[in-house]
Amino acid sequence: MELRSIKTFHTIVKFGSFYKAAEILNYSQPTISMRMKQLEQDLGVLLFERGKSLQLTKAGKLFYERTGDLLMQYEALKHNLSDLKEEEAGIINIGVSEPTASLIFPEILKDFLMDYPKITVNIKVDDANTCSQKLLDGTIDFAVCGEPELILENYYHPFFYDTLNVIVSDQHPLAEKKAVHLSDLAEERFIFTPANCPIRLQIEQHLHRELGNRYKKMELTSSMSHEYYVRENIGISIFTSTAHSKPFNGTKVIPILNLDITPPIGLLTNQKEVHFDRATKDLIARITKRFQQRSKELEGTSDKTITG
């Protein structure tokens, strides 16, 4: 029994004649008749009453009722497969903030693009507020970033909370310490991100409460460049554990015991984009899973610091 025979049967019933069905399906009438005869042979029952008017037998009525859902499911499946084909050749535009863009995203995309070789992924590396604006403008599909300033049309869902450490040159006196308090950082030169960075503002509030004016500062707009300046002992930098998750020669990462700032990383979406295609949903799931793993890694590091 072929699916095209079932479709032909439904067309005959719908339009009330073999002749009309032949016109609709672009077949000859003998072909239609032969197909129905073969279908009846396959089923072992008569579907039509033989006579002047087209009428269904009891078996024909039952077959018509039960196969209606089958045809609907088949059409839905064809539609889904068509969507899938389009997804596999689509484009995903993503906004990503540092250090996620440099240190986390490459390993996620490597596996994703192996599974979706026809997908084109474009990465826009920006801070959280710029990602939020690009999402509003429609130039990106979603973003993975810190928490931006509130915009009514955009939704932010944090799925990871980072911790902060201080990074120093391995020639710096603090490099001998396993952990520090903020008071240990008095009179140091801090290398900061720009003043409009939310985490920078929080860090400076804590420093000011603890040290007053007993520290110096300089700005470096490229967050991923800080460790190069630190290595030359130009200053020290307070940054996320993720940013310094991979060892950088000539530097030392030290936990800060009394700095209770946990910068979030999360998914930023727009209310208009509530229905992502399958490939995009899969990519978001992989991103979330990777940051769940990162949370466990941080917990393990924290336990070692406490017991050490």
UniProtKB/Swiss-Prot annotation:
GO terms for biological process: regulation of DNA-templated transcription. Keywords: Activator, DNA-binding, Transcription, Transcription regulation. It comes from the Bacteria. Residues 18-37 bind DNA. The keyword RNA-binding does not apply. One of its GO terms (molecular function) is sequence-specific DNA binding. It holds the Pfam family LysR_substrate. PROSITE patterns: HTH_LYSR. Coiled coil: none annotated. Residues 1-57 form the HTH lysR-type domain. One of its GO terms (cellular component) is cytosol. Gene3D superfamilies: 3.40.190.290, Winged helix-like DNA-binding domain superfamily/Winged helix DNA-binding domain. Positively regulates the expression of ytmI operon in response to the availability of sulfur sources. Belongs to the LysR transcriptional regulatory family. This is HTH-type transcriptional regulator YtlI. It comes from Bacillus subtilis (strain 168).
